[in-house]
Amino acid sequence: MSLSSLLPTPTNAIWDREDERRLVARGAPKIGALVSAKIAAPPYGQRKDWVPHTDADFGDGGAFPEIHVAQYPLGLGAPGNVGKKSDALAVRLDDKGKVKYDAIARQGHGKDKIVYSSISQLLPAEVLAEDADELQRPDEETVMETTEETRLALEKLTNQKITSALPVRHAQKAGPAQYIRYTPSQQGDTFNSGAKQRVIRMVEAQLDPMEPPKFRINKKIPRGPPSPPAPVLHSPSRKVTVKEQKEWKIPPCISNWKNAKGYTIPLDKRLAADGRGLQQVHINEKFAKMAEALYIADRKAREAVEARSQLEKKLAQKEKEKKEDMLRMMAQRAREERAGLRNPEAAEPSGSGATGSEVRERNDLRAERQRERQRDRNLQRAAPEKRSKLQKERERDISEQIALGLPAKSAGNGETLFDQRLFNTTKGMDSGYGDDEAYNVYDKPWRDSNTLGAHIYRPSKQADSDNYGGDLDAIVNTKRFVPDKQFSGASKEAAAGQRSGPVEFEKEEDPFGLDQFLNMAKKAPKRAEEKNNERSSHSDRKRSKRD
């Protein structure tokens, strides 16, 4: 015996919301029907025990107010749809029952935003209101009034321009007098002479035509705002193709000088941003003319510089030759003075025997030779470094007959002499190559012992052997530097002949003019004394004449 058997049968159906949700979550089994069934709500008055569960139970309408159960037609207000947002727009109808599609254009804009959704909204009000009074043609009277007002306004503007340009303006005509009734606020016998009202005559003040303007009238007035731009009607949006995207792609602005963030920019992007490939390169023909003119100017300038340098070299060479001549003369004089030579005019006639002066000269010459031999021995005993330095500083004898790198000249006819070793030899390329094992580069001496240089400083047989002693080998083995040209002023006959000794120079008495300067300085006080004596004698003469 159960409890349900004891209880009476329930009159209402049992419905539990939680059980219903579980069934919906599980999903009711789908049973295919052979005949389509149309689900509809029961008719009105028979819905006592019926509860809508699906969207199909509501049909196209809303909730059922007579059923006291929470209802969510089309899912509106359902607990699961509270936080969700939908882009669906509610369908609205206009006064004629047509769907208002302007809601699509207004979507996403504020309520105060003006959105033109039809062509009629873009037309001005004059076009829409064709029957308005403002658009009607005016009558003849209105046309005449407007014409007269326009004429007067234009005349006024023209007269103002003319009068402002004139240096002297005419006096303006005074306007008519105006009469104004004035009622004072303070009434009484003590005010306004007991009068309650007054009549005031208002007259325009007279203006001075010669008075300059008081205010600045040429101030520039800013322009008013322009008319609003015309609206642009856009075509419906369509998907942009890849080609259009590439055409609309604008390269970024890349600076050639600044890169604050240190980005690594490829060269093709730099060239695209530079835009050099978009413009056609055109080289002006005057660039070639300018380059040619610059080349000609540069060539002429180089020629001028070369000519100047050649001239300077010639002048420097002449100056050098002049100084060398002067040095040769000074050396000649010094050698003559050192050797004690005298001019034949100043020499006294010598007797048959040797005088004391000649003996003294020979002794001096022997002493000088002895000093030179002592110096050579000291050089040979000196250290190698010091010896090379002293040998460089040795006094060099100069000969005008020996020139380095130049052929010698014969004494008779002046023909050029060549090295005889070069003649009658078959040592060219056609004679074949030498033996590889032989080393005959220095098999022969470069200079022959029978040349002029070997005998030019050789003492003659008539010279005194005591003067030279054992200096012959030293003189032969000594290398001398020779000039490449003759001395200026030397005769060819003397140059061609053989010389028995080195070149001797005459010493100049006063090369820098110091003796002459000292003599002038010494004579200056004497001249001053002579002038003073002359002045004193002249003054004495004048005094004697006066006396």
UniProtKB/Swiss-Prot annotation:
It comes from the Eukaryota. Its main location: nucleus. One of its GO terms (molecular function) is DNA binding. Belongs to the SNW family. GO terms for biological process: embryonic development via the syncytial blastoderm; eye-antennal disc development; mRNA splicing, via spliceosome. Keywords: DNA-binding, Nucleus, Phosphoprotein. Residues 177-343 are annotated as: SNW. InterPro entries: SKI-int_prot_SKIP, SKI-int_prot_SKIP_SNW-dom. The keyword DNA-binding applies. Residues 333-398, 486-547 are annotated as: Disordered. One of its GO terms (cellular component) is Prp19 complex. This is Puff-specific protein Bx42. Residues 358-398, 526-539 have a biased composition (Basic and acidic residues). Pfam families: SKIP_SNW. May play a role in chromatin structure and function. It comes from Drosophila melanogaster (Fruit fly). It is found in: Nucleus. The modification Phosphoserine is found at S227, S235.
